[in-house]
A protein has these predicted regions:
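Active-site-proximal loop/turn and secondary-structure-junction residues that shape catalytic pockets
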Residues: 29-31, 56-58, 76-79, 117-119, ...
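Histidine-acidic metal/acid-base catalytic patches
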Residues: 1-47, 107-109, 164-186, 190-248
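Short, conserved active-site loops that position catalytic residues or coordinate cofactors/metal ions
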Residues: 66-68, 72-78, 115
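Short, hinge-like loop/turn segments at secondary-structure boundaries
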Residues: 69-73, 88-90, 129-130, 166-168, ...
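Active-site-adjacent beta->alpha loops and helix N-cap segments on the catalytic face
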Residues: 57-68
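Active-site acidic/histidine proton-transfer and metal-coordination neighborhood
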Residues: 2-4, 15-17, 81-183, 193
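Conserved beta-strand positions in the central sheet of alpha/beta enzyme cores
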Residues: 51-53, 72-74, 112, 149, ...
Length: 248
């Protein structure tokens, strides 16, 4: 059934979208739209979202006002300058540690991690550097109860050179880090471009997945008849696996 959100103003409530998956939205869906934080949160609440991904502490008051949570916080790493290159570690680490504290303070479940550009590094070298970094911060994530999620992105169309572009690479990284608080952010749009075979891949690797992102393909558009990804069976498969995280 519908779960009422917390009152936003006197007498104003919004129901959560019904279903077995807790749906959220990414901040990026509001790109190009002139809305302040409060307006963005209200729009997200109106469509039944549980929260918004990739927002920081400046959003926390508005999220709380509309009964939302920050489903994933930025963690200081970047698509180009990520944790696969040790020259970025000193800059990223304090930002990630602060993001973990911020997340714990508001009971946000996740902080995003980005591998970074290959930039001449082999996949093995990059993974070794990621393991070194994550082994330094994983204890804090475990102590605070916040999950670090490494995003899988496509290197074919949107992010040439991005290292964590295959599920198998991400899963191997998870196994090496060996922490219940390090998982993958499985982006269905990006992995459709890189691998396809979405449902089988998710079923085989759900233990390593902490969060999902979605979009249509081609063109990262809305889920309509122009897009090749048919989401209903994907969503059913994820729900049937007992997934308890967020789907944004």
């Amino acid at each position: 059934g519908l779960v009422p959100a917390r009152a936003a103003t006197a007498g104003e409530t919004f129901p959560k979208r019904p279903g077995r998956l807790k749906q959220g939205v990414c901040r990026g869906v509001f790109r190009g739209v002139k809305l302040d934080n409060d307006q963005m949160c209200r729009e997200a609440a109106k469509v039944g979202a549980w929260g918004i991904d990739l927002v920081g502490p400046d959003f926390f008051p508005s999220l709380k006002k509309y009964g939302l949570i920050p489903t994933m916080l930025p963690g200081g790493s970047g698509i180009k300058a990520g944790i696969n290159d040790p020259k970025h570690h000193a800059e990223i680490e304090p930002k990630m540690r602060q993001a973990l504290k911020d997340a714990a303070a508001v009971k946000a479940p996740n902080v995003i991690v980005l591998a970074g550009d290959r930039a001449g590094l082999s996949d093995q070298q990059g993974m070794d550097h990621c393991v070194t970094f994550l082994n330094r911060v994983k204890a804090q994530a475990e102590d605070l109860g916040v999950t670090l999620c490494m995003e899988l992105l496509n290197s074919k169309v949107n992010h040439p050179g991005y290292m964590c572009d295959k599920t198998a690479w991400g899963v191997e990284l998870c196994k090496r880090v060996n922490s219940p608080r390090f998982k993958l952010l499985y982006d269905i749009y990006h992995m459709q471009i890189m691998e396809g075979d979405i449902i089988r891949t998710i079923r085989e690797n759900i233990a390593w997945i902490g969060h999902f992102h979605t979009a249509g393909n081609p063109g990262r558009n809305e889920f309509d008849e122009t897009q090749e990804i048919y989401y209903p069976p994907i969503c059913r498969a994820i729900a049937d696996l007992g997934y308890q995280g967020y789907f944004s």
